[in-house]
Curated annotation (Swiss-Prot):
Name the UniProt record assigns to this protein: 3-octaprenyl-4-hydroxybenzoate carboxy-lyase
Pathway annotation from the record: Cofactor biosynthesis; ubiquinone biosynthesis
Membrane topology designation: Peripheral membrane protein
Family membership: Belongs to the UbiD family.
Bound cofactor: record note: Binds 1 prenylated FMN per subunit.
GO biological process terms held by the UniProt record: ubiquinone biosynthetic process
Chain residues that bind prenylated FMN: I175, Y176, R177, R189, W190, L191, R194, G195
Compartments, as annotated in UniProt: Cell membrane
Residue numbers binding Mn(2+): N172, E238
Subunit structure: Homohexamer.
Co-factor(s): prenylated FMN; Mn(2+)
Record EC number: 4.1.1.98
GO CC annotations on file: cytosol; plasma membrane
Length: 487
């Protein structure tokens, strides 16, 4: 499935009953977030608020509020198909030369998809049908949502921030929340390890007194949006991966005020710069953890131009205690991670990030155990192999007879196969999410690995218990007579 832009995707969703238009007047202050939250928790549709109170621009929420819609946005029918995308990413992350002609032929579909990677630059784009500059720039005219009563100000949530470091040809797309503090001012909250922050850091070192160019696209096509949240290799651009998802080159255009490329079909684009010497106190905001975060200083994004499509749609979301939209995205993208991990660690059978673990703070891994100490090797691998898991606090490793996605199974394995002293690994002074106030120091905390596997010789001196298994012949017999038993 290919979607030229966000509007084509919305048409498809509406045709499948996956989008509802709200014609009543709804306030972006708290009301939209409350409606979106209730809808998401019952697995409901995407919502287009056609009459935001005090604004003329409609607001789109809950777009990726179910795993099915995430899969549809990636051009797939269901989340199971996302594993194929993971296999492609694993191939692109560490491509190996084919061992023979037969293997070369087998790799042709993957290399064919690679042809869609280069972007197509347009001279004229829909995202620039309306251009505002100078005094015309007024962010207060956008229906930016205020999601929680304790939030300090409205918050831009689904902006795709485009940046480029001074030494890189590749441009980075990242999603960072942005606090509204003035008609042309936003606070750019990006963590130090994220692509945009790394580009900015390099820029400050190379050009300490020059403004850092930034463009932010709101309401891009679904493939481009989802490419920005997918664990792609560092050498691959988000635009290139969006082309792979779409099966068609990503159309971009040059920003009006800088050289950054923006999605040509985006609904709204904010252009401007960050002064390396200007920061502001950000927050507090209710976050995906279910708590309000601490205040901290971050760079200020000054908006010099706003461009948009005619009759533009403002795309937004809210975050809060799981489940929320980031948790749903994490649940769906979980399928993408598995083949990437399996390429490096073939012994991994399944990998699961429970949504209630705030998308990434706890991981359950099942393996085909092969030797003593194997579980600890896998723990270390999860923490170090992909940057996405550097903030994962807890890794639980189980045998392949345990269902990683069934808490009853996992808890049974922990309570019967784990000794608290022998089978827990604690590591101090590791990178931790700044939003994790449970850590003793902001950005620095500990990790715990739990080995809930059966123990091998060398790991225990005791005779190990044998799991009870049912006789398959008896199970089959009872299955055949079950309906006759009246039970």
């Amino acid at each position: 499935m290919k979607y030229k832009d966000l509007r084509e995707f919305l048409t498809l969703l509406e045709g499948q009953g996956e989008l509802v238009r709200i014609k009543q007047e709804i306030d972006p202050y708290l009301e939209m977030a409350e409606i979106s939250d209730r809808t998401l928790r019952k697995g409901g549709p995407a919502i287009l608020f056609e009459k935001p109170k005090g604004y003329r621009m409609p607001v789109l929420c809950n777009l990726f509020g179910t795993p099915k819609r995430v899969a549809l946005g990636m051009g797939q029918e269901d989340t199971h198909a996302l594993r194929e995308l993971g296999k492609l990413l694993a191939f692109l992350k560490e491509p190996e030369p084919p061992k023979g002609f037969k293997e070369l032929i087998g790799q042709l579909p993957q290399w064919k998809q690679v042809l869609n990677m280069p972007s197509k630059v347009l001279g004229k784009a829909d995202c620039q049908q309306v251009v505002l500059s100078g005094d015309e720039v007024d962010l207060y005219k956008l229906p930016i949502m205020h999601c929680h009563e304790g939030d300090v100000a409205p918050l831009v949530t689904w902006g795709l921030t485009v940046t480029q470091g001074p030494y890189k040809k590749r441009q980075n797309l990242g999603i960072y929340r942005q606090q509204l503090i003035g008609k042309n001012k936003l606070i750019m909250r990006w963590l130090s390890h994220r692509g945009g922050a790394l580009d900015f850091h390099e820029w400050k070192e190379a050009n300490p007194d020059k403004p850092f160019p930034v463009s932010v696209a709101i309401g891009a096509d679904p493939a481009t949006i989802l490419a920005a949240v997918t664990p792609i290799p560092d050498t691959l651009s988000e635009y290139a991966f969006a082309g792979l998802l779409r099966g068609q080159k990503t159309e971009v255009t040059k920003s009006i005020s800088n050289d950054l490329e923006i999605p040509a079909s985006a609904e709204i684009v904010l252009e401007g710069y960050i002064d390396p010497n200007e920061t502001a106190l950000e927050g507090p905001y209710g976050d995906h953890t279910g708590y309000y975060n601490e205040q901290e200083y971050f760079p200020v994004f000054t908006v010099t131009h706003i461009t948009m499509r005619r009759d533009a749609i403002y795309h937004s979301t809210y975050t809060g205690r799981p489940p929320d939209e980031p948790a749903v995205l994490g649940e769906a993208l979980n399928e993408v991670f598995i083949p990437i991990l399996q390429k490096q660690f073939p012994e991994i059978v399944d990998f699961y990030l429970p949504p209630e673990g705030c998308s990434y703070r706890l991981a359950v891994v099942t393996i085909k155990k092969q030797y003593a100490g194997h579980a600890k090797r896998v723990m270390m691998g999860v923490w170090s192999f992909l940057r996405q898991f550097m903030y994962t606090k807890f890794v639980i490793v189980c045998d392949d007879d345990v269902n990683a996605r069934d808490w009853k199974d996992v808890i049974w394995a922990i309570t019967t196969r784990c000794d608290p002293i022998r089978d827990t690994t604690l590591i101090d002074h590791t990178p931790i999410d700044y939003l994790d106030f449970a850590s003793p120091i902001a950005g620095l905390g500990s990790k715990m690995g739990i080995d809930a596997t059966n123990k091998w010789p060398g790991e225990t001196s005791r005779e190990w218990g044998t799991p009870i298994k049912k006789d398959p012949n008896v199970v089959k017999l009872v299955d055949e007579i079950w309906d006759q038993l009246g039970l």
